[in-house]
């Protein structure tokens, strides 16, 4: 049983000596990009449309910045002569306390890019770092796993430096960040740590993230701010 009866899932239709792209091709490519992203069904629901930005002025400011970044990213991608070349697009960092909505916004950016056919790989910091460390003695596995995040067209790092930070944690994330820094590959980053704290944890990583993000550093402040509590009201 084929998903597409027209091309029999070949994505192309043969017309004499010519192969014509089937109308299902773009849909299949988009599905593949989404599957490879590592973003769960739950997180796919985190969009700009479902974000409650009316809660607080800080939330609204962060929302506006994230929306504008997404629009600029898509525009730059659409205007690029080579659709695979997105290395001139800067990164974005969203930092703030627990429950400030930074994960929702970073996911909304990622989901917007995915909907436009732009590949994004999701990296939940603590989970992935733990998996990598558990297999650190397997050189082939280590290189392959780290390479996935180094070479992703767009990388979303969620909750950077969450949990107790060890020297090996810093070394692993430096490998990823430094590769992307040297190759101008954009990142979407969320963290509970503010910019100064990121620099204190590791200046080499923090300084690279700041340089890569340029004007796209969003700090969500406010002691009473908790997006998770108020979004349902």
Regions found by a protein language model. Name each.
Residues 1-61, 65-68, 216-217, 222, ...:
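A short, basic N-terminal segment
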Residues 54-64, 95, 114-151:
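Short glycine-rich substrate-engagement loop in P-loop NTPases that contacts/grips substrate
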Residues 65-85:
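Pre-Walker A adenine-sensing motif
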Residues 104-118:
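P-loop NTPase Walker A phosphate-binding motif
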Residues 118-119, 151-154, 183-189:
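Loop/turn-to-beta-strand initiation segments
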Residues 126, 145-168:
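Conserved P-loop NTPase "ATPase switch" module shared by AAA+ and STAND
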